[in-house]
Design a protein with these regions (language model features):
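Short, flexible, mixed-charge glycine/proline-rich loop motifs
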Residues: 61-68, 78-83
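Short functional micro-motifs and their immediate structural scaffolds
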Residues: 81, 97-98
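Cys/His-enriched microdomains
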Residues: 71, 87, 105
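Long, charged N-terminal interaction/targeting segments
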Residues: 1-59
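Short cysteine-rich clusters marking metal-coordination/redox-active sites
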Residues: 73-76, 89-92
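Solvent-exposed beta-strand sheet faces enriched in polar/charged residues
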Residues: 29-32, 63-65, 108
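Short hydrophobic/aromatic patches at helix-to-coil boundaries
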Residues: 109-113
Length: 113
C-alpha cells in the first residue's frame, strides 16, 4: 500500500518537470529502484493509472531499472556490488557490511511530448 504515496510523489515530481519543459504530455516515467526500495513497479503503474487521470501523465507508462546493491566491508574495506540474497564480502567472506546504496527510488527521466 505504500506505493500509493510513493506514486503520488512520483507523479508530482514528473508533472513539475514536464511543466518546466513546456511538455503537454508524459509518455514514459523512468525510475531507478534499489533492491531494498520496497517498490513494486507494477503497483506504481496501477496507482499511476488512477492518479494520473486528467493530468499530463494520463496513460503514462512506468519503466523501472533495478540498481545494484553496493556495500563496503567493515573488515577488509573492499567495496563491491552484491546480490541481496548473498550478503557477504566477496573479497574476505565477512558478513560485516555497510550498505552504500540500495534504497533508491528516483525519477531518472521522462519521455514527453
Amino acid at each position: 500500500m505504500h506505493e500509493l504515496s510513493i506514486t503520488q510523489n512520483i507523479l508530482d515530481i514528473s508533472l513539475r518537470a514536464a511543466a518546466a519543459q513546456g511538455a503537454k504530455r508524459i509518455r514514459v516515467i523512468r525510475l531507478e529502484l534499489g533492491p531494498f526500495s520496497g517498490v513494486v513497479p507494477e503497483c506504481v503503474q496501477m496507482y499511476l493509472d488512477v492518479l494520473g487521470k486528467g493530468t499530463a501523465a494520463e496513460g503514462a507508462r512506468i519503466e523501472a531499472r533495478r540498481l545494484p546493491l553496493k556495500v563496503e566491508c567493515r573488515d577488509c574495506g573492499a567495496s563491491a556490488e552484491i546480490d541481496r540474497r548473498h550478503i557477504q564480502c566477496p573479497a574476505c567472506g565477512s558478513l560485516r557490511l555497510k550498505r552504500l546504496s540500495g534504497r533508491e527510488c528516483t525519477v531518472e527521466s521522462l519521455e514527453v511530448d
